[in-house]
């Protein structure tokens, strides 16, 4: 059976890539996002797709039914469910478009499959309860997940909430119950090392600047042999702590020795910074972050997109591998 898919909050097309990666039969009938920069990247990679630059609340049930889609893939704004977003939940206007979709779901009787992604924390929200209640009301069976890319063999930490749902009249052998699943049944083994995604001869513009080197004590440093990396956020390269890992070609022993020497100097001092400069610490390039997030090698970012824009878009995107595995389960 060939499926017709509506991709909401399409961003740079992570869900589209995941659908292709899954090997399932179907096409993205329409993709919708209000972010013009994200849309330019999407169009660059998927020029044939019907991409709409508009507010999702402008999509009437009649328009969606006219497309005859049977599947909705979506990643609604996550800020209302984060600490930085003050956990405003349904009081945050950024939830309005998703609340609108929840509100019209009972009119979309042509839709049989749904996959939704959001940040960890969504599972405790009022919006989640409204979403789940509506799924039940519309005769969907659902399964919730909290999954990290490391559980599917990817060397990255990016814990996210996922919900897959399908109509109750469709037999679904996977359904596990009401508990949130944190591991998939398939064993993906330990994550591979970062070596395969590291670019050679990287431009010096990716070196960590002196003002950030002053905060080197909080860096999460990765090596070619590392089988892990921290979650890359949209603030990557702007803040030192908690926005993503830093890379060095130097051996661990050299880095360790540098930290030992640096500890004998005042944190942030000139000598402190000089010691860390010797490590040639650099940011992961946008291409490397794309690879860590499992985008295909053929995927690329247009040259007219600034570095800041690249990292912001990547920080808001999804892990392609995790989504593709969930799609296989959803359509099992």
Swiss-Prot record:
Q: Which GO terms describe its biological process?
A: methylation; tRNA processing
Stated consequence of mutating residue 230 to Q? Significantly reduced DNA methyltransferase activity. Significantly reduced DNA methyltransferase activity
Q: Where is the SAM-dependent MTase C5-type domain?
A: 3-332
Spell out the subcellular localization from the entry: Cytoplasm; Nucleus
Give the annotated active site: 78
Q: Which GO terms describe its cellular component?
A: cytoplasm; nucleus
The intrachain disulfides are: none
Give UniProt keywords alphabetically.
Cytoplasm, DNA-binding, Methyltransferase, Nucleus, RNA-binding, S-adenosyl-L-methionine, Transferase, tRNA processing
Stretches of the chain forming a coiled coil according to its record: none
Q: Which reaction does it catalyse?
A: cytidine(38) in tRNA + S-adenosyl-L-methionine = 5-methylcytidine(38) in tRNA + S-adenosyl-L-homocysteine + H(+); a 2'-deoxycytidine in DNA + S-adenosyl-L-methionine = a 5-methyl-2'-deoxycytidine in DNA + S-adenosyl-L-homocysteine + H(+)
* Binding, S-adenosyl-L-homocysteine: 12-14, 33-34, 55-56, 75, 79, 97, 316-317
Give the main EC class. Answer: transferase
Under the heading Gene3D superfamilies, the entry gives:
DNA Methylase, subunit A, domain 2, Vaccinia Virus protein VP39
What's a single GO MF annotation on this record? DNA (cytosine-5-)-methyltransferase activity
Q: What is its EC number?
A: 2.1.1.204, 2.1.1.37
Spell out the family assignment given in the record's similarity comment. Answer: Belongs to the class I-like SAM-binding methyltransferase superfamily. C5-methyltransferase family.
Q: Which function does this protein serve?
A: Specifically methylates cytosine 38 in the anticodon loop of tRNA(Asp). Also has DNA (cytosine-5)-methyltransferase activity. Shows affinity for both tRNA(Asp) and DNA substrates.
The name under which this protein is listed is tRNA (cytosine(38)-C(5))-methyltransferase
What is the native source organism of this protein? Spodoptera frugiperda (Fall armyworm)
Which gene carries the instructions for this protein? TRDMT1
